[in-house]
Amino acid sequence: GHVSCGKDGRACDYHADCCNCCLGGICKPSTSWIGCSTNVFLTR
């Protein structure tokens, strides 16, 4: 499933205004790559 994130708690998807999902389900702000192990973003 999706990972809740962001100030509004929306589900993590490709939405840049929400967040980027990195491999492993790690969710980070769309403006930060810190903590991401890969540049391949997942939708689920």
Swiss-Prot record:
Tissue: Expressed by the venom duct.
GO function term, MF aspect, one: sodium channel regulator activity
Keywords: D-amino acid, Disulfide bond, Ion channel impairing toxin, Neurotoxin, Secreted, Toxin, Voltage-gated sodium channel impairing toxin
Annotated positions of the D-leucine modification: L42
GO CC term (a single one): extracellular region
Major place of residence: secreted
Protein transport as UniProt keyword: no
Subcellular location: Secreted
Propeptide position ranges: 44
Disulfide bonds: C5-C19, C12-C22, C18-C27, C21-C36
Function per UniProt: Iota-conotoxins bind to voltage-gated sodium channels (Nav) and act as agonists by shifting the voltage-dependence of activation to more hyperpolarized levels. Produces general excitatory symptoms.
Domain notes: The cysteine framework is XI (C-C-CC-CC-C-C).
Family label: Belongs to the conotoxin I1 superfamily.
Name by which UniProt lists this protein: Iota-conotoxin-like Fi11.1
Organism of origin: Conus figulinus (Fig cone)
